Amino acid sequence: GIHIAAPGLAVQPGSPVDGLGRARLSTVYMPGYKVTMLPDDVVQTYTLQEGRDCPSVSLYVMLDEATLEIKSSETRLERVPIAHNLRHDQLDAVVTEQWLTDTAFEHQNDSQPASALREQLSFLYRLAKDLKAKREVVRGKPETFNRPDYNFRLVREAGAQGTEPQGQEEVQISIRQRGAPLDLIVAEAMILANSTWGSWMAELGVPGIYRSQASLAPGVKVRMGTKALPHAGIGVKSYAWSTSPLRR
């Protein structure tokens, strides 16, 4: 199952919260601080927080466990109990490809709850690699992650986290390699959800917010629209923006 926060259950069209979201359009991120698209109390109420039963739009995908062929899917609006929040910055060094694929390999300090979820994470990693490989066939060439991402962090006094920076903070820059197992699992889950929901809305004649790209030829840019069209860069028949309702 893929579970997405559902703030739209409470945000009514034309309401002050709806107006604020329409004015801001997206959350603004900067090192050590962010300006959220929605008011913080709305974000905190609807974020998928560990230890709570949270409103969610859920995509359930039924597949053949041996071949990983997708057989069917179902979308539900429900409350989902959130058991754990697994965070990249805490677990990328633990949830490695070797840890996921070699059952005999053990870290000296395995992190909980990741160690308790090793079997499930290993399957999700196998599924993510299969989904990526199938997209690359449609795409016509493999995706490469040869350029790293950079994390920016402000060194701040205790108690200052989450407050607006003052300008004198020390900035720490670290490298985070794209395509790490957790990164790949999340990315492929989001692509699967956005492409599945995009195709479903198109079948029903419901407009959505789509990203599309006609081809990978030089100069062909990604476009936004309200109709489902192929996205050559991702390798899917349609790609709707559906998985970041608290951010944009």
Residue ranges and their predicted role:
Residues G1-R248:
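Electropositive polyanion-binding surfaces
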